[in-house]
Amino acid sequence: IVPPKPSLSPVFVRNYTMASIAGVSVQDKLVYLYRGDKKLGEHRGDIGFTHKGLSGPGILDFSRNILSGDQLRINFIDDKADEFRSALITASEKEGKTAIQTYLKKYELPRSLLQLILKSIPIEPETRLAEITKIQRNQLVAAFCEYPFVVEKVGGFNMAMATAGGVSLAEVNSKTMESKLVPGLYFAGEV
């Protein structure tokens, strides 16, 4: 038996700063899972912001792998860090008078989310691309390519839409659903 645990659960975030945009969601974003400094995996999907944390298919599907204290990092723009940094440098040279908020519209993020991320750096939305310092550019890259959320906890059984664990599938014949350990014992449903 694999110990049962909640699955398809929302994630509660420590020191959550996005409660003001509860109800806002982003589509098809990449989420990275870190435990300490080690990247354990990544998952792509839609993400919803709640009053206390993260939800939506991109989080729910990944929740079985997440533990308290883990860090989720969300890539809001789908560019790799080096690509985004290069794009910002090029834009500052060619479109230097453009405000950072205007430039970032091409990534089609909800305005409220965009403003919260800029505020977290902090950088004023009206700051022109040519005025952005190297330090601010690095902060922009970190914030938009791997925005960090420290997991306080994963929703428990009362919030989970499914359960992970139970009978080990390694001990079940997948064609007949008969136990490999106890002949004549068959499983049905969520095992």
What are these regions (language model features)?
Residues I1-P3, S9-E131:
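An anion/pyrophosphate-binding glycine-rich loop and adjacent beta-alpha core
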